[in-house]
Amino acid sequence: MRVLVTGAYGLIGSACLARLHRDRHALVGAGRSISEARRRLPYARWVAADFARLTSAQAWLPLLADIDAVVNCVGVLQDGARDDTWRVHVEATTALFEACARAGIRRVVHVSAIGADHAGPTSFARS
């Protein structure tokens, strides 16, 4: 199976990628900065993706070409100059799910944090 793993060089994403590699899946890893990822995890094909900008299904569709399954491990811990928790955790994820439906991808795994709550005390918890 050809699997897209988002957030693929983070802690959880890289563990998912390694397991899928052991299971002999064809892998596409997506992340913001892929030069180090290519060096550390050479068994995946890498594509650069700024998840805060992938907030429409149309934006995701090119990344989903020829993909059979998606494992979404994207996550940011707090808002900052490069990170927007709401855009990444809510808008981009919603757009990814819509794009998967449009592309006919029925196998989607989404990794989230326990305790997510729209009334939470931090932007991370609220997203």
Model-derived regions: residue spans:
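N-terminal Rossmann NAD(P)H-binding glycine-rich loop of SDR-like oxidoreductase domains
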Residues: 1-25
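SDR active-site strand-loop-helix element
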Residues: 6, 30, 73-74, 108-114
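N-terminal Rossmann-fold cofactor-binding loop
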Residues: 29-38, 51-54
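A short helix->loop->beta-strand "cap" motif at the edges of active sites that frequently abuts
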Residues: 103-107
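Active-site Tyr-X1-5-Lys
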Residues: 119-127
